[in-house]
Amino acid sequence: MNLDLAYRSFVLGVAGHPQVERLIKHRAKGLVRRYVAGETLEEALKAAEALEREGVHAILDLLGEMVRTEEEARAFQRGLLELVWALAGKPWPKYISLKLTQLGLDLSEDLALALLREVLREAEPRGVFVRLDMEDSPRVEATLRLYRALREEGFSQVGIVLQSYLYRTEKDLLDLLPYRPNLRLVKGAYREPKEVAFPDKRLIDAEYLHLGKLALKEGLYVAFATHDPRIIAELKRYTEAMGIPRSRFEFQFLYGVRPEEQRRLAREGYTVRAYVPYGRDWYPYLTRRIAERPENLLLVLRSLVSG
């Protein structure tokens, strides 16, 4: 295992301890504000409006993972519906992202499908695009099944995510081609065993570019979710060399990460979106951000010292 993946594994392991969670929640509020738009829908909409003024579109994401009861799943669905209704009147592109575990995937695929179907029935006529996030490897197959089911039911304003660090992803991409998916490509942020995921960052990066170029060659619309300057530069070079119009792809960033680069790409004429998370259940999201970059851990330590 290389140092990058060893660091990520260490951080995700430590962050799972209840004492660490309590400490960060109590003393690292400055870091939370950097990466999370707020705990309320109103705060998230204000953050989205600020991004729009800079030429960057927003992806709204109500945080929350792995509900334990059907009642919790339905409560989370109500939060999603409130988000859809709030976006309906906005003049800018409307886009939300969600995880199927938030809608009860671990309880029942039928429950998650039914709740998501109701969200899409409200979202599509209001011009709200819905992205299904991909979670850890045990949930990939179920997520893909539900995506295919929704497309076969006629829903078109729904997209999927694939992760370049999983060995299976190229086959998943090829299997999805008949559905002409709107694809978000990510490297992957979950702690995965070497049996299912590439153990080396260089291999993950190479696979990311391979999958991205393959998707473009197949005519898919691709959202490249990456902060890696080398990958962004190569994708810009490749699309220009191949004559692929900028209307066929976009770049996506996390809220608070490389904001200057977001604005620069937007000024260059690329479509740029920032993933804007909000809600009270922000801790799992924040720990994955800390695990992605060692400098984020330094910010946590400073926050813990300064309070």
From Swiss-Prot:
GO molecular function annotations of the record: FAD binding; proline dehydrogenase activity; protein homodimerization activity
Cofactor details (free text): Binds 1 FAD per subunit.
Keyword check for Flavoprotein: yes
GO biological process: proline catabolic process; proline catabolic process to glutamate
Reactions catalysed: L-proline + a quinone = (S)-1-pyrroline-5-carboxylate + a quinol + H(+)
Regulation: Inhibited by L-tetrahydro-2-furoic acid (THFA), L-mandelate and L-lactate. Inhibited by N-propargylglycine.
Binding site for FAD: M134, Q163, K187, G188, A189, K201, T226, H227
Keywords: FAD, Flavoprotein, Nucleotide-binding, Oxidoreductase, Proline metabolism
SUPFAM superfamilies the UniProt entry points to: FAD-linked oxidoreductase
Pathway: Amino-acid degradation; L-proline degradation into L-glutamate; L-glutamate from L-proline: step 1/2
UniProt: substrate binding residues: K99, R288, R289
Family of the protein in this entry: Belongs to the proline dehydrogenase family.
Stated name of the protein: Proline dehydrogenase
